[in-house]
From Swiss-Prot:
Keyword terms, alphabetized: Cell membrane, Cell projection, Cytoplasm, Cytoskeleton, Differentiation, Disease variant, Glycoprotein, GTP-binding, Hydrolase, Intellectual disability, Lipoprotein, Membrane, Methylation, Neurogenesis, Nucleotide-binding, Phosphoprotein, Prenylation
Name of the protein: Cell division control protein 42 homolog
Residues modified as (Microbial infection) O-AMP-threonine: T35
Ranges spanned by the short sequence motif Effector region, renumbered to the chain: 32-40
Length: 191
């Protein structure tokens, strides 16, 4: 059975772990526990063939900047996450996350993933952002960034309501399997 390695990166507290737990167990975790490094595996059927989707969670906190890339070798696809209600996490996609993964894995495809879309219409969240003269990130803004950074595409979801959740992983699998160039050379290798 072929394995697809999918690594999830992004700022701390944008919902990377919730995304993975909600997808793999259909349950939403109730409390926030920062991740050091976890992985999950699910079997998915693609075109009648079973694949193991290996999902690797990483810590977004800066303390782990030297440790995190140890999970990058052999990655088939990255999910670069930001919260649609955290403009700073969106900014860090461009400033930190995409430079980091493209430095270590220049040929590995990645998707830009907007999380916490259930909060985009939440009055108290909107109010908090407005106090700092900020607004939630729109899909159009995120799609433009995805194009500028050469992401495979932009997808968004809510781990809480599961809206768009399965699509994120379906698109990740497609990105890992679609060969714009020979498959072997696209895996991340640290020398």
């Amino acid at each position: 059975m072929q394995t697809i390695k999918c690594v999830v990166v992004g700022d701390g507290a944008v919902g990377k772990t919730c995304l993975l737990i909600s997808y793999t167990t259909n349950k939403f975790p109730s409390e926030y526990v920062p991740t050091v490094f976890d992985n999950y595996a699910v079997t998915v059927m693609i075109g009648g063939e079973p694949y193991t989707l290996g999902l690797f969670d990483t810590a977004g906190q800066e303390d782990y900047d030297r440790l995190r890339p140890l999970s990058y070798p052999q990655t088939d696809v990255f999910l670069v996450c930001f919260s649609v209600v955290s403009p700073s996490s969106f900014e860090n996609v461009k400033e930190k996350w995409v430079p980091e993964i493209t430095h270590h894995c220049p040929k590995t495809p990645f998707l830009l993933v907007g999380t916490q879309i259930d909060l985009r219409d939440d009055p108290s969240t909107i109010e908090k952002l407005a106090k700092n003269k900020q607004k939630p990130i729109t899909p159009e803004t995120a799609e433009k960034l995805a194009r500028d950074l050469k992401a495979v595409k932009y997808v968004e979801c809510s781990a809480l309501t599961q809206k768009g959740l399965k699509n994120v992983f379906d698109e990740a699998i497609l990105a890992a399997l679609e060969p714009p160039e020979p498959k072997k050379s696209r895996r991340c290798v640290l020398l």
